[in-house]
């Protein structure tokens, strides 16, 4: 498994709405994530800084990257644009984090 972590932002007035939209995520999005090899996906909110920290274990970079081209992912990104900064293609603005420590 490949461990990934990344950081995103959430609008200051949208913390509750962001959480509401993820509890639960759309069933079809869950199916796509799992069928593309995503496991143990978690997102954490830092309310003081309006930051979201995400971790996910993936089976391959290729399968993970393929999620972005699915219809359900495209619809999800568009759905989330009013609660978080987005790129021109509606994907969330995010930065990958470098792992500096891991205790198995």
Curated annotation (Swiss-Prot):
The lineage of its organism: Bacteria, Pseudomonadati, Pseudomonadota, Gammaproteobacteria, Enterobacterales. It catalyses: alpha-L-rhamnose = beta-L-rhamnose. Homodimer. It is found in: Cytoplasm. Belongs to the rhamnose mutarotase family. InterPro entries: Dimeric_a/b-barrel (IPR011008), L-rhamnose_mutarotase (IPR013448), Rham/fucose_mutarotase (IPR008000). The keyword Isomerase applies. Substrate binds at residues 18, 41, 76-77. Pfam families: rhaM. The active site is at residue 22. SUPFAM superfamilies: Dimeric alpha+beta barrel. It is an enzyme of class 5 (isomerase). Involved in the anomeric conversion of L-rhamnose. Gene3D superfamilies: 3.30.70.100. GO terms for cellular component: cytoplasm. Its EC number is 5.1.3.32. Transmembrane segments: none annotated. This is L-rhamnose mutarotase. One of its GO terms (biological process) is rhamnose catabolic process. GO terms for molecular function: L-rhamnose mutarotase activity. HAMAP family: L_rham_rotase. NCBIfam families: YiiL_rotase. Pathway: Carbohydrate metabolism; L-rhamnose metabolism. Keywords: Carbohydrate metabolism, Cytoplasm, Isomerase, Rhamnose metabolism.
């Amino acid at each position: 498994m490949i461990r990934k972590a990344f950081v995103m932002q959430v609008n200051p007035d949208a913390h509750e709405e962001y959480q509401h939209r993820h509890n639960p995520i759309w069933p079809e999005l869950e199916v796509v994530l799992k069928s593309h090899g995503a496991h143990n996906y978690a997102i954490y909110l830092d309310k003081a800084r309006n930051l979201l920290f995400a971790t996910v274990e993936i089976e391959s970079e290729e399968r993970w990257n393929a999620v972005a081209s699915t219809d359900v992912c495209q619809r999800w990104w568009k759905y989330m644009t009013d609660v978080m900064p987005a790129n021109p293609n509606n994907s969330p603005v995010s930065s990958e984090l470098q792992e500096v420590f891991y205790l198995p």
